[in-house]
Regions:
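Extracellular and organelle-lumenal recognition/adhesion modules and their flexible linkers in secreted
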Residues: 5, 14-43, 161, 184, ...
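Structural signature of tandem alpha-helical TPR/SEL1-like repeats
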Residues: 38-46, 71-83, 108-117, 143-147, ...
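Canonical positions in the second alpha-helix
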Residues: 49, 86-87, 120-121, 155, ...
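Structural marker of alpha-solenoid helical repeat scaffolds
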Residues: 52, 90, 124, 158-159, ...
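TPR alpha-solenoid repeat register
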Residues: 59, 97, 131, 165-166, ...
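Structural register within alpha-helical repeat arrays
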Residues: 62-68, 100-101, 134-135, 166-170, ...
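Residue at a conserved register position within TPR or TPR-like alpha-solenoid repeats
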Residues: 67, 105, 139, 173-174, ...
Length: 410
């Protein structure tokens, strides 16, 4: 009997111990789940996350950052500072808390204190976006262009949201010669964000001429732009009436071009995104037109359904006043004289300067030739191949394997 009593007492004690351990484990599990949930929602609902895990310095730091935003009141900033200090006691490496203290110090006008705080922030991490933004503004305020661009570079390499926020600011500054020169040096190092920036500025820069000067300087450094970026910038310059800037930039991409001559006379360029100064397919729906490359050069092939006509191929020109010869060679053109395709040169505002008919290819071995006179009041021109509607069942078909516009005597 005494043995059974002792066994019973031990069993009761053991069960009490096990119950206490189970309760403790459940409590720890609840804390763990609560912390995991808090960390998962730290960006979407930082206040709720902080209430679930007020001991987590990283979450406390994020709450301090939210309270110190651009629209924060004086009371908000006091609360943010208190949370930031608490966060650093909980986690001395909580960089957002350091940035909060630095920003609020700057807002109060304590610039030297802000610089000291942000220096510490940069020692902890180069990835904090608010630290980078402050550093950019501080460098700009001191006239330190290289320093500002260094921080742009760091921010753009370390933050996924940086391009959306910083590209518009950066392109607005390229009208300044010193900024543009420094930016060229930065882009010449080929940063990871360089191609994305070039594509962005080609279509979005507020000053297309400044963008052209930037791209020309990059060309001199061996930094080529994509066909799409080149085409976008040339189009912007031309639509803005800046023909000379457009041609200067185009000639930096294509050294040796002569404004008195059309380009790519044998269709060998093989461009995916041609600029206005290159050959462009301009046919309407239903018209089949392609530029194809072969072993002996390229060829322009076209097929137009019956009763349909219109432009097929076009290239923008910047010809000086004078007389010009258009000459070329066709293959497979076999139309009645009244429906033969023809080349037309017209001024930018639409005034026609003349036509050169493409005769049947069996005539003169496919050669065609004609003249245009460009007057002084026609600063920009468009050379276009036109198809005329025909009642023939086969429609209008043919190929052009060579065409050249040149001044008389050249």
């Amino acid at each position: 009997m005494p043995r059974r009593g002792a066994h019973a007492r031990r069993s009761a004690a053991e069960w009490r111990a096990r119950s206490m351990l189970a309760i403790a484990a459940a409590g720890l599990g609840a804390v763990s789940v609560s912390h995991s949930l808090a960390y998962a929602m730290r960006f979407a609902a930082v206040e709720r996350a902080h209430s679930l895990a007020p001991w987590d310095g990283r979450i406390t730091a994020l709450l301090s950052a939210k309270l110190s935003g651009p629209e924060a009141s004086t009371a908000d900033r006091r609360s943010a500072d208190g949370l930031a200090r608490q966060a650093l006691q909980q986690d001395p490496t909580a960089v957002p808390a350091v940035a909060t203290l630095g920003i609020d110090a700057q807002i109060r006008g304590a610039t030297s204190t802000a610089r000291r705080i942000f220096t510490y922030s940069e020692m902890l991490s180069r990835r904090d976006f608010r630290t980078r933004i402050w550093a950019i503004e501080d460098a700009v305020g001191r006239g330190d262009i290289p320093g500002a661009l260094r921080n742009y570079d760091i921010a753009l390499r370390t933050s996924r949201i940086a391009p959306d926020l910083l590209f518009p600011v950066l392109i607005s500054a390229i009208t300044d010669d010193k900024v543009r020169a420094a930016l060229v040096r930065t882009l010449a190092t080929r940063p990871a964000w360089g191609d994305q920036f070039i594509a962005y500025v080609s279509g979005n820069g507020p000053d297309a001429s400044a963008t052209a000067r930037l791209f020309e300087a990059l060309q001199q450094r061996g930094i080529a732009q994509s066909e799409g970026a080149t085409a976008a910038l040339v189009s912007r310059l031309l639509s803005g009436g800046k023909v000379e800037d457009a041609w200067r930039y185009y000639s930096s991409v294509h050294p040796g071009v002569d404004r008195r001559l059309s380009r790519d006379s044998e269709f060998v360029a093989n461009l995916t995104n041609p600029s206005s100064f290159d050959w462009n397919l301009v046919g309407d729906s239903g018209i089949l037109a392609t530029i194809q490359r072969g072993e002996r050069g390229g060829i322009f092939d076209f097929s137009v359904p019956p009763s349909l006509g219109g432009p097929l191929l076009e290239q923008t020109q910047w010809l000086p006043p004078g007389v010009y010869i258009l000459e070329g060679h066709s293959i497979g053109v076999n139309q009645p004289d009244t429906t033969l395709p023809y080349w037309v040169l017209h001024c930018g505002e639409g005034r026609e300067l003349g036509r050169v008919v493409v005769p049947a290819s069996e005539q003169d071995n496919g050669r065609f030739v004609g003249r245009f006179r460009v007057p002084a009041d026609c600063p920009i021109q468009h050379l276009t191949l036109m198809a005329r509607a025909t009642e023939q069942m086969t429609g209008t078909t043919g190929q052009i394997n060579r065409v050249r516009l040149r001044p008389v005597g050249k």
